[in-house]
């Protein structure tokens, strides 16, 4: 009974914290604890890329309906209540156009200044493992015991806990609002590349410079 009461109070406190005005948070205050990075990192670049792709039909359409990009950001922020991996996989499957086709990259002229976005690639995170050689299998004779291999059960993806889900949604909702407001109020919004604004702005919101426990901004 005591555990149930404590859980209810934690849920109420987290819900109240989520409803606190988003406009009161600055970019630095939107930073979340490092243990949530593993949930935010795979989603951040995909949110920016997908929302920028939906608004890539032209700067004129964007200027006529500036709420379109904000709506896309809010939609993805609300959908992040589900497990991040499931949302990421579903969204990638539903994409009809590759971001590289929507935003073609021009080759950097020789001697020109190279931007960090020139190496931009939209791919899920991958881990490189060192090469590992299996030991040679022993030769089995007619009198050798029978070796039975028991397959290990598949590892199911871990769902976010209630508190982690609320914290993640709050952080992403705050950062998407900051990103949309920053990119849509830029003086050259009609002629600038939205992709060049969305990804760095989202990175800066989640991983602000000078954060005590922060890591270098991720590259989408």
Swiss-Prot record:
Keywords: Nodulation, Signal. Residues 99-120 are annotated as: Disordered. Induction: During nodulation in legume roots after Rhizobium infection. It comes from the Eukaryota. Residues 1-17 form the signal peptide. GO terms for biological process: nodulation. The keyword Oxidoreductase does not apply. Pfam families: Nodulin (PF02451). Belongs to the nodulin 20 family. This is Nodulin-23. It comes from Glycine max.
């Amino acid at each position: 009974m005591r555990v149930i009461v404590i859980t209810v109070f934690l849920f109420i406190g987290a819900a109240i914290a989520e409803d606190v005005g988003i406009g009161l948070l600055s970019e630095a205050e939107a930073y979340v604890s490092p243990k949530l990075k593993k949930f935010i990192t795979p989603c951040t670049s995909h949110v920016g890329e997908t929302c920028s792709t939906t608004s890539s039909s032209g700067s004129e359409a964007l200027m006529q309906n500036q709420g379109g990009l904000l709506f896309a950001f809010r939609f993805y922020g609300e959908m992040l209540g589900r497990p991040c991996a499931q949302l990421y996989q579903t969204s990638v499957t539903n994409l009809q156009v590759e971001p590289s086709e929507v935003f073609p990259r021009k080759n950097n002229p020789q001697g020109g200044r190279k931007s960090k976005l020139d190496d931009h690639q939209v791919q899920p995170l991958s881990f490189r493992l060192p090469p590992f050689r299996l030991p040679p299998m022993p030769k089995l004779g007619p009198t050798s015991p029978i070796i039975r291999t028991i397959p290990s059960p598949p590892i199911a993806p871990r769902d976010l806990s209630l508190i982690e889900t609320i914290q993640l949604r709050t952080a992403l909702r705050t950062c998407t609002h900051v990103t949309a407001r920053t990119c849509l109020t830029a003086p050259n919004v009609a002629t600038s590349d939205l992709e060049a604004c969305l990804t760095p702005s989202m990175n800066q919101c989640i991983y602000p410079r000078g954060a005590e426990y922060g890591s270098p901004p991720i590259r989408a």
